[in-house]
């Protein structure tokens, strides 16, 4: 019973941390001061850059090297976030 409680607590903590990181990433994107339409385009572009590029390279039987986010951004939870 104790093990189940510990595992449940750990899972809740991981989910909470992930949600908090995503909220932080969104708030950092909003601080840039771009209009919403431009912000959505940048967000989609950066999300693709982090998460899909590695999968495309793997399909070609090559070593997977994730693309790095550029211009003061870093990849975190498959999203580029402002440093």
Swiss-Prot record:
Tissue specificity of this protein: Expressed by the venom gland.
Q: Which SUPFAM superfamilies match?
A: omega toxin-like
Q: How is this protein annotated for GO cellular component?
A: extracellular region; host cell postsynaptic membrane
**Localized where?**
Secreted
- Tell me the GO molecular function terms: toxin activity
- InterPro entries (UniProt xref): Hwtx-2-like (IPR012625)
- Keywords of the record: Disulfide bond, Neurotoxin, Postsynaptic neurotoxin, Secreted, Signal, Toxin
- Signal sequence, start to end: 1-20
Q: Which cysteines are joined by disulfide bonds?
A: 50-64, 54-75, 69-80
Top-level taxon of the source organism: Eukaryota
Q: Name one Pfam family in it.
A: Toxin_20
Q: Which residues form the propeptide?
A: 21-46
What this chain does, per the record?
Answer: Postsynaptic neurotoxin.
Similarity section: Belongs to the neurotoxin 12 (Hwtx-2) family. 02 (Hwtx-2) subfamily.
Report the protein name in the record: U4-theraphotoxin-Hhn1x
Organism field: Cyriopagopus hainanus (Chinese bird spider)
Native organism taxonomy: Eukaryota, Metazoa, Ecdysozoa, Arthropoda, Chelicerata
